[in-house]
């Protein structure tokens, strides 16, 4: 029996502008399964926030389909499944923390008893009970994010969406915040969707990810799969053409990244020692770098971006050659 994705995005496109259209999202497709801790990663301007605003229906005009737990996000019922924490916290200036949380709890349809239990528990858990009757608009970034998380948990969401949740947080607060989200993911089977460009902080939490770059999806799936596919050795020499010929003669698959003029080769453990000895014995080039690549999200991300840029260059060359041939 197939499992319905908690998030399913099909052929999403989003443009801005009236006379001159600026296409931000280009045929975006990805899915998140129930209970996953999912990282949505990309550099600033890649389209992360635009995608999230389409998911939560902040943007109404976009092309094609978004489903939340099998329900179109244009259907009001889909809103009961999700909670959202924006990158920047904005609070009414006239409400204190107690008033703000009780108001949002009522709007979420919770009973006063449920609101009291949740507010009391989470204020104590986050050690901010002393801020109950102070205005969150005046809090530090970390304290504001804690209040937003308490608010987001009123409706017991199946999916928690967070846009750059740890931006401007100190390391201690950042770890505390992410640890709580991970606990909710494991204990409540709540799917967590985190947009970030700080990859190191997601390393210990996420089990799946989507990589977006210049409005296009480069990867969507389990981290263990992409880690396996991108594991290898980084190789840089003083004569790339000679190295390329030697690798072909050895029948060793490689990827070449012209932006940095280096190579990635995938080797089995038993191959690596023999390969290294023969590599350093070659007279036609000098080895500058021969280093094993780790399976960190940063290395995975770098490899995907380098491959994307290489493909773009190759595509541009092919188009130019076709034009010249006409």
UniProtKB/Swiss-Prot annotation:
UniProt-listed Pfam families: ABC_tran
GO MF assignments: ATP binding; ATP hydrolysis activity
InterPro entries in the cross-refs: AAA+_ATPase (IPR003593), ABC_transporter-like_ATP-bd (IPR003439), ABC_transporter-like_CS (IPR017871), ABC_Transporter_VariousFunc (IPR051782), P-loop_NTPase (IPR027417)
Every ABC transporter domain range: 7-239
ATP-binding found in the keyword field: yes
UniProt key word Nucleotide-binding: yes
Residues given in the record as ATP binding sites: 42-49
Keyword list, A-Z: ATP-binding, Nucleotide-binding, Transport
Gene3D superfamilies: P-loop containing nucleotide triphosphate hydrolases (3.40.50.300)
SUPFAM superfamilies named among the record's database cross-references: P-loop containing nucleoside triphosphate hydrolases
Membership in a protein family: Belongs to the ABC transporter superfamily.
Name of this protein: Putative ABC transporter ATP-binding protein MPN_334
Lineage: Bacteria, Bacillati, Mycoplasmatota, Mycoplasmoidales, Mycoplasmoidaceae
């Amino acid at each position: 029996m197939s499992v319905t994705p908690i998030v399913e995005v099909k052929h999403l496109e989003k443009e801005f502008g009236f006379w001159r259209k600026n296409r931000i999202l280009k045929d975006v497709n990805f899915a998140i399964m129930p209970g996953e801790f999912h990282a949505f990663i990309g550099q600033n301007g890649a389209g992360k926030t635009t995608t999230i605003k389409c998911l939560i229906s902040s943007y109404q005009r976009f092309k094609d389909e978004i489903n939340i737990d099998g329900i179109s996000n244009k259907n009001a019922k889909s809103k009961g499944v999700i909670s959202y924490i924006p990158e920047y916290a904005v609070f009414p200036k006239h409400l204190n923390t107690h008033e703000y949380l009780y108001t949002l709890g009522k709007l979420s349809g919770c009973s006063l008893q449920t609101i009291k239990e949740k507010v009391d528990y989470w204020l104590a858990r986050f050690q901010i009970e002393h801020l109950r009757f102070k205005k969150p608009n005046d809090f530090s970034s970390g304290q504001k994010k804690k209040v937003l998380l308490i608010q987001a948990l009123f409706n017991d969401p199946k999916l928690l969406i967070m846009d750059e949740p740890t931006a401007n947080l100190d390391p201690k607060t950042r770890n505390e915040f992410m640890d709580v989200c991970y606990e909710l993911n494991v204990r409540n089977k709540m799917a967590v969707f985190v947009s970030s460009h700080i990859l190191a902080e997601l390393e210990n939490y996420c089990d799946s990810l989507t990589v977006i770059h210049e409005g296009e999806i480069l990867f969507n799936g389990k981290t263990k799969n992409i880690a396996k596919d991108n594991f290898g050795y980084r190789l840089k020499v003083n004569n790339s053409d000679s190295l390329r010929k030697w690798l072909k003669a050895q029948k060793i698959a490689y990827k070449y990244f012209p932006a940095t003029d280096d190579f990635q080769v995938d080797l089995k453990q038993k191959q690596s020692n023999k390969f290294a000895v023969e590599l350093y014995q070659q007279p036609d080039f000098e080895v500058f770098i021969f280093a094993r690549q780790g399976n960190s999200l940063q290395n995975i991300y770098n490899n995907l971006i380098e491959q994307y840029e290489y493909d773009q260059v190759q595509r541009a060359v092919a188009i130019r050659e076709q034009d010249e041939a006409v």
